[in-house]
A protein has these predicted regions:
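N-terminal subdomain of nucleotide-sugar transferases
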Residues: 1-49
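Structural motif
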Residues: 2, 97-98, 196
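A nucleotide-sugar donor-handling region in carbohydrate enzymes
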Residues: 34, 160-223
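Generic beta-sheet signal
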Residues: 34-36, 53, 102, 123-126, ...
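Short, structured coil segments at secondary-structure junctions
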Residues: 46-47, 116-118, 193, 216-218
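Phosphate/nucleotide-donor binding subsite
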Residues: 49-98, 147-156, 173
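Conserved nucleotide-sugar donor-interacting segment of glycosyltransferase catalytic cores
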Residues: 82-151, 204-206
Length: 223
């Protein structure tokens, strides 16, 4: 059995997937990782195959690249990011039996898994990534977000967050899905996070606040 583990981020995003990969290897699985090129030499030294994706994170860690761009340049970068993901993850996933994606920039992996007819699992490292009436969505300053008041209506904020996901990524993702013969995505955030994500966080330090409103929250498995 072969598993593809994919993330786009810095060391804190990559290392948990590497730990998962080592455990899967110990169980006899073949593991392949899609990660930024910075980590290739280290991970290959652990006996796992690496397919580089995205830019080196060292070059983007000091300044948020989107914060310094015009809206048109932001759109071009977003389109390029999605196109690169569909190409890279699409090639890396060939011959794999499952895709595990971590961090919310997994914009192509769910479509690639659907196209190949294999399972896809999204993993969050912190409860705040996942919709819940008990906390606010992540604050993205480059998008113009500001921290909400302590007693804000979190459900309304999550509803707006879903609208923002659709506005930012919907048409870009749907264009690539159409090329694969897949239907458009109605809810981009749910498409990325899935309805049954894993929460890889210590249940004491980062517990999932159950019970919750099933109409607005996914069914979370805390690992």
């Amino acid at each position: 059995m072969r598993a593809l583990l994919s993330t786009i981020g810095s060391r804190g995003d990559v290392q948990p997937l590497v730990a998962l990969g080592e455990q899967l290897q110990a169980l006899g699985l073949e593991v392949r990782l899609c990660v930024p090129p910075d980590f290739r030499e280290w991970i290959e030294g652990l006996g796992m195959a690496v397919v580089p994706i995205g830019p080196e994170v060292r070059s983007t860690g000091k300044v948020d690249p989107l914060a310094t761009l015009t809206p048109q340049q932001q759109r071009q970068m977003m389109e390029g990011t999605v196109a690169s993901q569909f190409e890279t993850i699409g090639a890396a996933a060939r011959g794999c039996d499952i895709i595990v994606g971590a961090t919310a920039l997994q914009l192509a992996a769910p479509s690639v898994a659907q196209h190949l007819g294999i399972p896809y699992v999204f993993v969050a490292y912190c409860p705040i990534v996942l919709p819940s009436r008990h906390h606010a969505p992540p604050v993205l300053t480059w998008r113009g977000d500001a921290p909400p008041p302590a007693m804000a209506d979190y459900r309304a904020l999550w509803a707006k967050d879903a609208q923002d996901w659709n506005a930012m990524w919907g048409s870009i993702i749907d264009a690539h899905r159409a090329a694969l013969g897949l239907a458009p995505v109605g809810d981009v955030r749910s498409y990325v996070l899935t309805n049954q994500p894993w929460l890889a966080a210590d249940p004491t330090l980062g517990p999932w606040p159950e019970p919750d409103d099933a109409a607005t929250s996914p069914t979370v498995t805390q690992t």
